[in-house]
Amino acid sequence: MMSGDGLLVRIKPAFSRLTSRQAQMIALLSKRHGNGFMDITNRANLQIRGLKQSDYPLMLKDLQDSGIADKHEARDRLNLILAPFTESQSVGWRCAEALYNAADAFPALPSKFGFAIDCGTTRYLQHASCDIRVEIDETGQLLIRLDGCEQGYVTSEEKFQSDILQALHWFVSS
């Protein structure tokens, strides 16, 4: 996206996580291809600023080769915030994996449409900007909830992917 100081490249780390090596790579790429300035967005993304149009293909290749950007476009476009401290074997992590795996089947969504996955006992993302929240309710059931709604739809891990797709199709048709 073009900004006043050149292109702006938005990086959406998969599972809202970066390794220290990836963070160092982003800093290096920001200096190499951009103006050295980065921003952190409200949706847990990083933005590298000041890129020249001619440097964009090299930057994208470097991001993909280092595992920071996904070579699979639908997965890379997914706006997903995963609660901090979510462990890789947890329900929240598996729900995030299900969303990444289903990304090709998603209907056309607005560019800022996003998910917040907050399945722990503490709500870390209650104020995070998103359209669909995935949570565990007080009885321990998996819940899909439209942002701003008190009530949600109870689902299971087995039905999660199909229930999310149904919710997304409802969203775009309404």
Name the predicted role of every residue range.
Residues 147-149:
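A structural-propensity feature for long, helix-poor, extended segments
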Residues 6-143, 154, 158, 162-165, ...:
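Small-residue-enriched alpha-helical segments and adjacent helix-cap loops
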Residues 170-174:
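Membrane-embedded hairpin module used as a gating/binding unit in multi-pass transport
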